[in-house]
Swiss-Prot record:
Quaternary structure and partners: Homodimer.
Keywords recorded for this protein, A-Z: Cytoplasm, Endonuclease, Hydrolase, Magnesium, Metal-binding, mRNA processing, Nuclease, RNA-binding, rRNA processing, rRNA-binding, tRNA processing
One of the GO BP terms on file: regulation of gene expression
Protein known as: Ribonuclease 3
DRBM domain boundaries: 155-225
EC number in record: 3.1.26.3
Active site positions: 46, 118
Pfam (any one): dsrm
GO molecular function: double-stranded RNA binding; metal ion binding; ribonuclease III activity; rRNA binding
Keyword check for rRNA processing: yes
Gene name for this UniProt entry: rnc
Binding site for Mg(2+): 42, 115, 118
Cellular compartment(s): Cytoplasm
The species this protein was found in: Shewanella loihica (strain ATCC BAA-1088 / PV-4)
Record function comment: Digests double-stranded RNA. Involved in the processing of primary rRNA transcript to yield the immediate precursors to the large and small rRNAs (23S and 16S). Processes some mRNAs, and tRNAs when they are encoded in the rRNA operon. Processes pre-crRNA and tracrRNA of type II CRISPR loci if present in the organism.
Length: 225
């Protein structure tokens, strides 16, 4: 495979210049492209990201409960958030993907972008140390840490369940009513039924979980009117 171009430029964008540039190249290599891919680095980066964000939240919110801290952390380290950061860095321009992933637009896929961000954190840890990782991660997350609050971190499914339980209502029933598209780009249609609404509410997304959350959010909005 040809080397990835413009890695020093990516280093400047990230705010870190690698001593071992091969680590950055490996962090950007999807398993579809080479045997020496980024999954082990992703494993490292996932753990480092979790401890850095956990520590930041612990000190930022001294009165927050364990549950609140866990929910805020989940919001900040989720794949969607990591993919947003990756897009800010235009990380898709630097990914090394196999022919199949290239053809299917893998450089735009949230899961691939998120995994690469975690792998980069793991690569920086091996190239430097955890304190360097901490400084960089906190800089990347600065604006997000500034606005996150202990409230409203529960996902729509949890909020809907708690709302119904508070009124001693039966729990919602979620049913997948349709799955379309090819295996790498499926679309899920899920309906959510609750006793308070005559008709089921539909959610559509690229995963069952997301579709359920969309449906739950719509149900919440309707029953609270």
């Amino acid at each position: 495979m040809e080397p990835i171009k413009n890695l020093p430029r990516l280093g400047r964008i990230l705010g870190y210049q690698f001593q071992q540039i091969a680590l950055l190249e490996q962090a950007l290599t999807h398993r579809s492209a080479a045997s020496k891919h980024n999954e082990r680095l992703e494993f490292l980066g996932d753990s480092i990201l979790s401890i850095v964000i956990s520590d930041a939240l612990y000190h930022q919110f001294p009165k927050a409960t364990e549950g609140d801290l866990s929910r805020m952390r989940a919001t900040l380290v989720c794949g969607k958030m990591l993919a947003e950061i990756a897009k800010e860095f235009k990380l898709g321009d630097y990914l090394k993907l196999g022919p199949g992933e290239l053809k299917s637009g893998g450089f735009r896929r949230e899961s691939i972008l998120a995994d690469a961000m975690e792998a980069i954190i793991g690569a920086i840890y091996l190239d430097a140390d955890i304190e360097t990782c901490r400084t960089l991660v906190l800089n990347w997350y600065k604006s997000r840490l500034a606005v996150i609050e202990p409230v409203n971190q529960k996902d729509p499914k949890t909020l809907l369940q708690e709302h119904l339980q508070g009124f001693k209502q039966p729990l919602p029933v979620y049913t997948v009513v349709n799955i379309s598209g090819e295996a790498h780009a499926q679309t899920f249609t899920v309906e959510c039924k609750v006793e308070q609404l005559k008709e089921a509410v539909i959610g559509v997304a690229n995963s069952r979980r997301k579709a359920e959350q969309i449906a739950a959010a719509e149900v919440l909005e309707r029953i609270k009117k």
